[in-house]
UniProtKB/Swiss-Prot annotation:
This is Imidazolonepropionase. It comes from Deinococcus radiodurans (strain ATCC 13939 / DSM 20539 / JCM 16871 / CCUG 27074 / LMG 4051 / NBRC 15346 / NCIMB 9279 / VKM B-1422 / R1). Transmembrane segments: none annotated. Keywords: Cytoplasm, Histidine metabolism, Hydrolase, Iron, Metal-binding, Zinc. Catalyzes the hydrolytic cleavage of the carbon-nitrogen bond in imidazolone-5-propanoate to yield N-formimidoyl-L-glutamate. It is the third step in the universal histidine degradation pathway. The lineage of its organism: Bacteria, Thermotogati, Deinococcota, Deinococci, Deinococcales.
Amino acid sequence: MSETLYTGISQLATPRPGPQRGAAMGDLHIIEDAALLVRGGVIQWVGPRAAAPTATHVHDLGGRAVVPGLVDPHTHAVWAGDRLSDWEAKLQGATYEEILARGGGIRSTMRATAAADVAELVALARPRLASLRASGATTTEVKSGYGLDFDAELRMLRAVRELQAEFELRPTLLIHVPPQEGRAEYVVGVCAELIPQVAREGLAEALDVFCEKEAFSVEETRTMFAAAQAHGLRVKLHADQFHAIGGTELACEVGALSVDHLEASGAAQIAALAASETVATILPGVTLHLGLPAAPGRQLIDSGAIVAIGTDLNPGSSPLFSTQLALALAVRLCLLTPAEALSACTVNAAYALGLSDRGSLSAGQRADFLVLNGQDWREVAYTLGGNAVAEVYLAGAQL
C-alpha cells in the first residue's frame, strides 16, 4: 500500500473532525512547519515536521499552506439553456413576474433541461464541476429539480451518476417547482412513483424539497419527507428564502440533514436550528447575484447552530462557479470569520451531506486536501477573483 509523507507545509490549518458549532467553529488546529502522512488514501498522522515518522515516499510541498478539501453541499450543476436574458431584464427593472410572462424564469430552464438527453446534460455539467473542483471542492452535492416531468428528473440524476466518480458527487432528488395544474396528484406521484424508482436505482442519497409560499407547503413537504425516509433516503430542505413558513421547524423536527438558504430566518428559526443536529447551510452567492438580504450567518453561529456554506450554483440566482469564492463571500456578506468559514466549508458541509470521513486533516480521515499558492491558510478566505488553490489532492492523489 502506497505511503507518502508530505513535508514543506508552511502552515496546516484544519477544524477538528465532526460537526462544529458555536465557538468551536473558529477554533482551528493550526500547525506551523507541518507534515502529513498518507497511506492508502487515508491520513495516518499529522503534526510538526520535526516529529514526523519515516515513510516510503516523501513529497515536499514547497513551503506552502495546506487546508482540507472543500465540500460544496448545495449545487444545481446539471441544467441546459441559460438565463442571460432574464438577468439583463432584471437589471433593467423587470419584475420576476414580468420575466415569467415573457417565457423566462425557472420554467425556461426546465423546458431546456427537459429537452436535453443524458449525454447532453453530462457534457454541459462537466466543465461546471471542473470549475468547482479547481476552486478546491473535493466533494460536491448535485441536485435534480429542473425536470418538467418525472422522466426529466430521472435523466438529470442519471447524468449526475455518469459524473459521480469523476467529481466525487453526492446526488440529491429535488422537488422544486409545483406543477401549474394537478398539484395534489403531483405530490402523490412523487411519493408513489418517483421516490420509489429513485431509491430502487440508487440515483440519490437524499430528497430535497423547496418549502416556500410560492412552492410546496409544510404539509406537502412533510408527506414527501415521510415517503423518502420510508425508502431509505435522507431529507433536506430549501427553506426561509423569502418567507419563514415553518419549513425550518419541520426539518429540525424530522432530523433533516440540512436547511438551506435561511435569508428570511428569524429568532424562532435560528433557535430551532441551534437546538438541533440539522445543519444551517448559507448560500452567499444568492445574496451577491440577486441583491437580497444575506442569511444571518453571524447570529446562527453565535446561537450555537451548525453552519455550512454552499455555492447554490444555478443559472437563475447564483451563477457561482467557485466554492472557494462562496467561502470568501460568507466572510464579507454573512459576517463569518475566516476560521469559521473554513469549518463551514469543510467538516460542517460534509456533515450536511451525512459524511463523517472527510473535512478535517486528522488521522483516519480521507486525505482530501488543498495546497495553496501562499504560506498563510487565510489566503483561501481573503482572495477574490483569483484562485488561492495551487494543487488539489483527492484521497492522497493529486488531481
